[in-house]
Amino acid sequence: MNRTVQSYASAMFRVLKDDVYSPAVVQQQNTFAFGKTSSLCTDNHSANDQCERGENVTESSQDHVKRPMNAFIVWSRERRRKVALENPKLQNSEISKQLGYEWKRLTDAEKRPFFEEAQRLLAIHRDKYPGYKYRPRRKAKRPQKSLDADSPILCNQMDVETLHPFTYRDDCAKTTHSQMESQLCRSQSLILTNSLLQKEHHSSWTNLGHDRVTLDTRISADFPFYQSLEPGLSCAYVQY
């Protein structure tokens, strides 16, 4: 490509230097340059097509050795043709599913001749290709589609990020953290309140029991004094 551009530039320089402007000469040079660039483009397109199909250039030049057929392939060759003729509207995937279902329903006696044929083909394949090793072809990785700079999704995302500097995840994390802190504070306050109520209740019961014990002790201590008084005075003293 660089040589073509250089030859074209040198030709134009010679025309301008000689002060001879001939449209025929310029057209001839343009045609020559265009022919070379078009051939290069076609070669590149063919190579790109092979890469997109997953074919290697070095492997395509060599003869690909097929794997020996197994019993199912031997049986499905003729059966696939019959099913395709009987049901022309069926797709290849649907035919394959039907063949797999039919193969499972066959008995061992019905499968035996196809296994024998597969063994015979395997022996022939070993004799023909003694150093054969199965090497599956690698599929070419398709490039992931990236969003264009003018796509509405990307523009909307950029606008949102411009208006709101904090992302959605950060806001959610902060909101969740604040909610957890508030719930923790509430739970701690409830626990503290319950503990204070329990202590107050326990202290009230303790004081009440202590007062009752003190009253009983005082009554038992003053009991001889109550007996020495007259009945009316003792009742009045107790009521007082």
From Swiss-Prot:
Assigned GO CC terms: cytoplasm; nuclear speck; nucleus
PTM: Acetylation of Lys-141 contributes to its nuclear localization and enhances its interaction with KPNB1. Deacetylated by HDAC3.
Compartments where located: Nucleus speckle; Cytoplasm; Nucleus
Presence of keyword Nucleus: yes
Keyword Acyltransferase part of the UniProt annotation: no
Annotated region of DNA binding: 65-133
GO biological process, one term: male sex determination
InterPro entries per record: HMG_box_dom, HMG_box_dom_sf, SRY, SRY-related_HMG-box_TF-like
UniProt keyword list: Acetylation, Activator, Calmodulin-binding, Cytoplasm, Differentiation, DNA-binding, Nucleus, Repressor, Sexual differentiation, Transcription, Transcription regulation
A GO term for molecular function: DNA-binding transcription activator activity, RNA polymerase II-specific
Matching PANTHER family: SEX-DETERMINING REGION Y PROTEIN, SOX TRANSCRIPTION FACTOR
Subunit structure, interactors included: Interacts with CALM, EP300, HDAC3, KPNB1, ZNF208 isoform KRAB-O, PARP1, SLC9A3R2 and WT1. The interaction with EP300 modulates its DNA-binding activity. The interaction with KPNB1 is sensitive to dissociation by Ran in the GTP-bound form. Interaction with PARP1 impaired its DNA-binding activity.
UniProt record similarity statement: Belongs to the SRY family.
Function in brief: Transcriptional regulator that controls a genetic switch in male development. It is necessary and sufficient for initiating male sex determination by directing the development of supporting cell precursors (pre-Sertoli cells) as Sertoli rather than granulosa cells. Involved in different aspects of gene regulation including promoter activation or repression. Binds to the DNA consensus sequence 5'-[AT]AACAA[AT]-3'. SRY HMG box recognizes DNA by partial intercalation in the minor groove and promotes DNA bending. Also involved in pre-mRNA splicing.
Protein's name in the database: Sex-determining region Y protein
